Amino acid sequence: MFGDRQRPMVLVLGLGESGLAIARWCARHGCRLRVADTRETPPNLAALTAAGVDFEFVGGAFSPALVDGGIELVALSPGLSPLAEDLAPLVAAARERGIPVWGELEFFAQALAALGANGYAPKVIAITGTNGKTTTTSLAGLLCERAGKKVAVAGNISPAMLDKLTEAIDAAALPDVWVLELSSFQLDTAHTFAPDAATILNITQDHLDWHGGFAAYAAAKGRVFGPRTVRVLNRDDAEVMRFAPPAAAADAPRAVTFGLNEPAADGDYGLLRENGIAWLVEAIDRDGADAPAAPSRRRKQEAANPPDIALKRLMPADALRIRGLHNAANALAAYALARAIGLPAAPLLHGLREYRGEPHRVEVIATLDGVDYVDDSKGTNVGATVAALDGLAQRAVLIAGGDGKGQDFEPLAAPVARWCRAVMLIGRDAPALREALADTGVPLADHATLEAAVRAASALAQPGDAVLLSPACASLDMFRNYAHRADVFRSAVEDIALEKGTTL
């Protein structure tokens, strides 16, 4: 359960949702606990006390002295960067003493290994990427359920993995399939995690301050793959395709790709555009044997004799209830993951048609006088906003801005020039956005509030357009969180609807 340690003394750093779950899990298994948080009274302190857990609490600045006194294992909450000025010396001190540093995902992986010794062998699906994780995770969970499996969905999507596992153990209802949404923070401190199938949906700039740079951020995403994990890769993303196994490697894991073009290799997924209809398709080798060769042997055969590929139509893309080409890609990824663990196609396709999407993720909240009002408040980075604009593929008045987290806004310029009638700028980093978009030829307007930006956008939008809130930025400079930002947007749209004599 804890590597080669039976009941170690554990230092839990940070008492957020994940830290609380780790503390409860460790206490459940007889560990001695020291819990530290930079806040003197973190919100979850009362919850941990109420759970009857015996622990020592240390509030205030982190210091290397926290690993003194017999600490054998350090548990790091995902919100805490090991590179942070107050934390780096502590992490260094732990490693100098040979004390492992784990995150919740590593505790979860160790727990599954321990349960596996008693015969528990679930399938594990993992989803990461800069954008699209929650949609793909929720959809993959639904697909597995529709295939008749008992499914647990957890991770970055909430609830915490260890809380979900505890609940399942106590209910004597361990799932057949785990579907996990994983952030780069969670993956950074994983060491033995090895899911059956995993995807990296995309990799664009985000959380660079936490990881110390783009290379480290991308490397953290790559930790989602174990040595035998089926790799489901976005072939439209060059950074993702760096994780494709080498073709010549005899022991290379199986890999399949998805993308918005026609797939060219057996088992890959994509889109076929024919007679004005876009189809979700799977590439099938017409000459393939009923029993497929091992991956390395198959690659050698394909090199000698290129396969005769046919495209099997799965369903029209328009039959998906989630909007945008980026969501077609997410649907293909979820389907590929479910197929990778051996689930039958028919119930999965029914699930794809059923899924309605997640709130605040390219969610059409109203159509007024022919104008769509689209809430993409969860679009907190440049890649998300690029995906929203390209995915909607319609003329838009974009509302963007907030806390840019040190991102480069230049990649927004091309899709803004292609799709935007105008851009309404809000928030702290509006000047940086203005500079990045200055040469697009698209009108730019600054607004002190989101409400003012929505009104101005509504006045400019034409029938067939979208008023798109996709900020490309975090929200904390103006709002409590992205959901609060979405609520303000919705309220402003409701006011406009009332003035037009209707309601949402």
Curated annotation (Swiss-Prot):
Pathway membership: Cell wall biogenesis; peptidoglycan biosynthesis
Entry keywords, A to Z: ATP-binding, Cell cycle, Cell division, Cell shape, Cell wall biogenesis/degradation, Cytoplasm, Ligase, Nucleotide-binding, Peptidoglycan synthesis
NCBIfam families: murD (TIGR01087)
Record's GO cellular component terms: cytoplasm
Gene: murD
Example GO biological process: regulation of cell shape
Enzyme category, top tier: ligase
A Pfam cross-reference name: Mur_ligase_C
UniProt record similarity statement: Belongs to the MurCDEF family.
Listed name of the protein: UDP-N-acetylmuramoylalanine--D-glutamate ligase
Xref: Gene3D superfamilies: Mur ligase, C-terminal domain (3.90.190.20), Mur-like, catalytic domain (3.40.1190.10), NAD(P)-binding Rossmann-like Domain (3.40.50.720)
EC number: 6.3.2.9
Location of this chain's protein in the cell: Cytoplasm
S-adenosyl-L-methionine listed as a keyword: no
